[in-house]
Amino acid sequence: MLCTAGDGVCVILRLPRPKLHDRGGSVNTQYERYSFRSYPRDELMPLESAYRYGLDQYGTENWPDTVNYLEISLRLYRLLRDSEAFCNLNCSTVQMADVGLEGNVGGIKDGSHQARSLSEFAELRVFGDVLKRTQCLKRCKQGLPAFRKSQPSREVVEEFQRREPYKFLQYAYFKTNNLPKAIAAAHTFLLLHPDDEMMKRNMAYYKSIPESEVHIKDLETKTYETLFIRAVRAYNGENWRTSISDMEMALPDFFKTFEECIAACEGSREIKEFKDFYPNIADHYVEVLKCKLKCESNLTPIIGGFVVEKFVATMYHYLQFAYYKLNDVKNAAPCAASYLLFDHDDQVMKQNMVYYQYHKDKWELSDEHFKPRPEAVLFYNITTMQKELFDFAMQHLVDDDEGVVVEYLDELLEGNAF
């Protein structure tokens, strides 16, 4: 019995036991025609148009075109996110000082008692950097194909974030007798929707097919996930060097993916109401923060149906023990300190640190060896500050009670703030 997306109808299929022949190539080739820098011209179209057309074809049971356009829309979505991340990352450090306005503003000359550099005008400096960064982004986007077509609505983007296209793709694959991809698409959707009854029933049907397990793959898997799984398997087999090698590659790849994720959050925004200047800026930034705060959880692997809790900390946990087993305490101690950044109450890791410190002379450890690794500190600081800013906004920037505002203004007036 297989269920269809959209109406939730389950159809009893009286078919001979299907064979697992992949008519559309390996399930690993979901993005085989995808290239960020040289996207195929014949596929370049508005993301929303491709997606809506694919859904229309699904409604008319035109399964080949459903598959074609939904796959294209997935590649277009990846292109858009990669393009947003590319431009925002490359323009993230641009400042107004780069165009020579640092030392001479408004005709006031250096050396006079009135001389001021741009850095002394806090607001002008901030918005000068904003203008320069905007110029950089404009130039960058003009050269990328993803921005040459109309941009998708927020609702469509959110559907892709929820992996909704795979709900329709899995049935279209099934109807085109591409069971390997149908199984992979169903699994890909279920990873984010483990309680979806319709897809759970479909997956149960697929699993009843002999040799189906080999096709249970996440079509949106990231490189660091594969490296992490390999590292854990090596760890469980006590292959410490292999585990360390793969885990040390997984860490920077995760941080790179995380950086790209938060950069991609800085895309376009739909303005729904007009506000004063600063409240409008704050609203936009809070929306961006909300997106960025989802990156860590969205990038956390789901293995065997279970989320890897405290993923970054977990990688350092594996590393510190593997290094210790190789008697490489100079690398084990910083990993232990890095783990404690994210879980400072972990008693086992605290005991490990006490043990390392007690034997520091034996292993020739300095104070530097008991500090977290720089990339761990950077990730911790970014995620912590993002959460603090968002919490502040939720606490103080929601619609105020009129009486509270009056009391606050009274305090300002009493303090001669105006």
Specify the residue positions occupied by each region the protein language model found.
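Alpha-helical linker/edge segments of TPR/alpha-solenoid repeat scaffolds
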Residues: L20-Q30, S92-Q151, Y171-F174, Y206-N236, ...
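Short, charge-rich amphipathic alpha-helical segments embedded
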Residues: G24-G25, S35, W63-G103, L190-S208, ...
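TPR-adjacent "capping" and linker segments in tetratricopeptide-repeat scaffold/adaptor proteins
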Residues: R33-E48, P152-E164, S212-E225, I302-V312
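TPR repeat positional signature
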Residues: E43, L47-A50, Y166-F168, Y173, ...
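Residue-level recognition of tetratricopeptide repeat
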Residues: P46, L80, R162, L179, ...
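Hydrophobic/aromatic side-chain positions at a characteristic register within alpha-helices
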Residues: Y51, Y58-G59, Y77, Y173-F174, ...
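Conserved small-residue packing positions in alpha-helical repeats and bundles
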Residues: G54, Q170-A172, N177, H187, ...
